[in-house]
Amino acid sequence: MSSLYYANALFSKYQVASSAFSTGVFPEQTSCAFSCSSQRASGYGSASTGAPVSSSSSVSLPSMYTNGTSLSSHTQGMYPTAYELGAVSLNMHSSLFDHPNLPMVSAGDLCKAQSSGKEEQRGYHQNNENNLRIYPWMRSTGADRKRGRQTYSRYQTLELEKEFHFNRYLSRRRRIEIAHALCLTERQIKIWFQNRRMKWKKENKSTDRCSPAADQIGGDEEEEDDE
């Protein structure tokens, strides 16, 4: 009996206390807790259903994303130009080596081109040599030079024949005078007189009454004059 009495008394006290707390001892705290719990529940519900939390957040977030997309598109517009330039430069470098329309050149063609170039150079040098005038004083007098037959004009031959008719042997002074008068060298005058004497001897071999001693004396005099 005593235990039941104490239990009923405690139970009645607890009921009085709970009614006191529920009537308004801490009314704001219970409402705040309820509002927070309701906000959390609504937040969880929106997260589970995928609905936007608030209108302001729903407006601000897409605008931020749209700005991000515009920035990304702007950067994409900047970089492809650089990549395109790189591609163009690469194509330019590759075009230097890709020539499908050009014919293949062989070693024989190169040899022919070189030979034709050499022939053109030879022709050019020959034309230049033909255009040059070579005077007698420009010709070399060395022993290795090929000696051609000297041709005399009609006037030169006539004057030399006249001189030979009077003198078959010339002194050096007279030889120099004739060379200046006929525009010939002293050597040419000497050679002409030697050849003319040999011809005269052959023509007048039978009728010539001159002794060989006289010819020898004349030759010695000419050699002395040369010295």
Curated annotation (Swiss-Prot):
GO molecular function: DNA-binding transcription factor activity, RNA polymerase II-specific; RNA polymerase II cis-regulatory region sequence-specific DNA binding
Pfam families, alphabetized: Homeodomain
UniProt main location, coarse: nucleus
Feature: compositional bias, Acidic residues: 218-227
Compartments, record wording: Nucleus
CDD domains: homeodomain (cd00086)
Disulfide bonds: none
Keyword Acetylation: no
Residues in the DNA-binding region annotation: 145-204
Region described as Disordered: spans on this chain: 201-227
GO BP, one annotated term: regulation of transcription by RNA polymerase II
Residue span of motif Antp-type hexapeptide: 134-139
One GO CC term, this protein: nucleus
Keywords: Developmental protein, DNA-binding, Homeobox, Nucleus, Transcription, Transcription regulation
PROSITE patterns per record: ANTENNAPEDIA, HOMEOBOX_1, HOMEOBOX_2
Function, as annotated: Sequence-specific transcription factor which is part of a developmental regulatory system that provides cells with specific positional identities on the anterior-posterior axis.
Family: Belongs to the Antp homeobox family.
The protein's name in its UniProt record: Homeobox protein Hox-B7a
Organism from which the protein derives: Danio rerio (Zebrafish)
Gene name of the record: hoxb7a
